[in-house]
Each structure stands twice: as structure tokens, then as C-alpha cells.
């Protein structure tokens, strides 16, 4: 049989050297082929996008005056004032308490549910598995509005409980209340990490335990739970870092009662202040950025060390479902309570609130049904514009982000570019950049861009697409990367034997094989950018508000009905898009 990888006749190579392929028959530009141009263009674009918000933030933190004033000198005084005058130390402790409690509650919710849904024989496990993922598609801002509508001091459920028993045994406007709401929003992320690990586990370990007489609960305790250590630790750090940077729940719950965390500190000092102290703002942003970068570095280290816990080998069999006996029913109740009280009731109440003039158990809400909240949205052009802007940003941004992520993945994983590892680091770097810091940093970057380019971009949808795109890029990269790594390199080699260069190999072979993964990245990026809002707080303008920033403005004005209407519209858009995308991609092997 002829070996297709045999060195071509006349190839100038050592007898035992690497395979040599025919030189691609394409023109070069300035001494570089088109593949090299793509490599360098990719790394330059990523470097500019990632460094644009970071560099101005660091410079402002070390400057004695705002960046727009000339004659500034470098100083560390901003950091000294941050901890002595701005009471940032207390803010850091509050953030630590909030993020720590959120992480604990998230793991307590997600890990048992992953074990019960994936590894046991509870009834309705498929439905519960899908239901556990849906809170991911809803922004924590909307979830926060829903919880206040139902469980806040004047919420529907709170008012009903107070009238029935005389008191309400919970208070959302506390650190535990904030942490519980955020945990409900973040539990699907930890659940997916643990569920995927359990689905891919080798059944031989459990089979060995069964042969020595171990029962279902002993197998869970001695085999299943220890295997979850890597995903639990990794997801814990991920949840902690997301809690450190989150704005929505602390802004809605904490700010009215004086509870300040990192994100609300930036929001209050950067947006709500009449005369912002940019030095304090830059120093605080730098500290928060360093914290999130450290957490991401720890994540990467733990992910590399997780190979020591590999339990999936060749010819592994899928584990059997464990019979819990009568315990399955309390487990079902636990899951139903989470889904019902954590997501269904708050979101259902928020949707119902959008169709009523008032919403309280003290009066029959069905007697107050109205479309006035939606009429208000349709009558005011600025509200309609926010919906249109969100759709444009999400649609255009999803395409741009997915294309950039695809190119970055292929260059990082399947090229010989000497800096391909740096491309991967740059593509994943934005996961360590909180949304508010991206907004603040890009605001400063646009203000000092050369040739007045920043003034053209600032306050436009293009600026928001850049900010939101940075937030979505790591997820898109992570969605496409496994698909590229699963494609055998022999396909690349065969194309190179035929004289194709790297770029043609990518466009004619790899691009077609990873189309399903590209579709998954497109859906993920669209949903992520549709529910995003924090960078737009600093990058948007009155004409470029998105749904999230408009809901915040309406909430401050006390228009809870209009907030509910906009939230419902965003939920419907997300549900329709995800549903249609699922139908279009049905039959393709996509793991989103």
C-alpha cells in the first residue's frame, strides 16, 4: 500500500528528518505568505483588544491627575488613599464575605444535583437536567428583579407570608440574601462542570466497588464524590471570581442599604459621583483586576493538575444508574424546590408583573391586568431603541466574536506559528477582566486613541460591541477549541501533500469539520452579549442604551412595570433564539 505521507520525489530533506511537503503555490507579500499575515493579524488584533482596557487603567492608577490633564507624574498615592480615605479595606472584606458565601451555597446546590440527576435513577432526570441549565440563559440582573418582585420587602410572596404569620423570616437586602440569589444564578455553571465529569467517568471503578459488596450510598461516598474533586475545585474558583466581579445583585440589594462590594464601589465612584476621583477609580480597578487575574491563574494550574485524577480511559463503559430506593423522592423534592422557588416563581412573577398595574396579594392581581407596561415601551422611542440596540450588538457581535475565536483556536492549536501559545493566552485573558473594568478601561482608551479615532467610536454601538465581545470571547474560544483538537492532523497533512498552504487547509477542511462547534459558539456568544450590560454603563450613550442599562434606569425611576416588560421581552428573545438555533442544529453533534 502506498503511504500518502511519503516524502515527494526530489524533496530536500535528511533521510531521517521530518516530512517535507511541496511548497504552496501562492504569492507572498513583503516576503511573507498569506498564512503568516493571518497569524500576525490575529495576534495583533487580540493584543490590541486585551491591552486597550488594561493599559489606561494601570496608567491612571499610577498618575497623580486624570489622564485628560497634561503634566501628570507617576505616584503610588492613589493606592494609599484607596485604603485610607476610601474605606476600600472594608469593601474588600465585604466582597470576600459575599463571594465566599455565594461559592459555598452554589456548590451545595450544584454538586448534589449533578450527582442525583446524572448518576441515580430519579424520575424525570432528563427534564431536571435541562431545567438546571436554563437559569444560565437568564441574566442575573433579571433574576434579581424577579427575586425582589416575589421575595423583596414588598414582594408578592413576602407580603403574603407577612399577612399569614405576621413576619417575613428572610431579608434579601443582606449579604446572605445577596449570596443566595447569586448562587441560584451561578449554580448551573458548577452543575455543568460536575455533570460532564460524571457522564465521562469510567464505570470500572464503581464496578470494582460493587464486587466487594458496596451499596449505592457507599459507592457515592467512596467513588463518585472523590472523582468530583477537580470539577468542584475548579468551578468553586470560577464561581468565586464571578461573584467578585458581579454588579447586578449587589447593586439591587446592597446599595440601598449601604452594602458595598468591588463592583458597586466602581459603579458609585465612577458613574454616580458628580466629580469622580479617577486616581481612586484606577487604583481600585487595578486591585480588582489583580485579584481576578490571580484567580484565573489558579484555575489554570488546577486544570493542569486535574490530569492526575483522570478516570476515563480507552474502552471505558458508561456507569450504571444507582438505585436510591425511597431516598429518590426527597432528592426530587430538593431539585423541585430549587427550580420552583429559585427560578420559576421569580421569573414567572416578573412576567406576570409585566401584565399588571400592581402586583400584591392584598388585592386580586387579575383585576389589574393591563398592557400599559408594554404600551409604554412601544410609545417611547428610547425604550424601543434599547431593544434594537441589544439585538444589533448581540447579532453582529456574536458573528465577529465567533469568527475571531475560530481563527484564534485554529492558529493556536493547528499552526506552526512561534507565538501560537500567546494567542491562546490573549484569547482567554478577558475572563479575568470584570465587565465594569472593561468599560472603564475602554472609555479611557477611546479618549486617548490617536488621530481622534476614539471620539468616533466612544458612545456608539461599535464601542459596546467591542466591550461585550471581550466578555464573550473566552467562552467562544473554549467552545470551539475541543472540536478543533478532535480533528486528526492526518487531514492537514494530506492537504499539505497536495500543495495547500495552512490557510487553504483551514478554509477547505477544518472549517467544514468544525461548523457545528462554530454554531454552538455563535449561540453562546449571542446569549452572552444579549444579557450583558455592565461595560455599556461607561461605553454607551443616551442613544445607544441596551436592555440592561435601560432596565436599571427604569428601576431607579420606580417604573417596576416597565422593567418587568423589558425583562420579559429579553427572556422571550433568548428563548426563541435558543429554540430556533436548537432546531437548526438538530442532528449535529454540538456540545454547547
Map each language-model feature to its residues.
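Membrane-water interface segments at the C-terminal ends of transmembrane alpha-helices
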Residues: 34-67, 80-199, 227-248, 252-254, ...
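Glycine-rich helix-loop "coupling/hinge" segments at transmembrane-helix boundaries
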Residues: 69, 248-275, 362-367, 533-560
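Short glycine/proline-centered loop/turn elements that form peptide/ligand docking sites
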Residues: 201-205, 487-491
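Polytopic alpha-helical membrane proteins, predominantly small-molecule transporters/carriers
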Residues: 72, 92, 213-214, 387
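Transmembrane alpha-helical segments of polytopic membrane transport and secretion proteins
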Residues: 1-44, 299-337, 418, 582-592
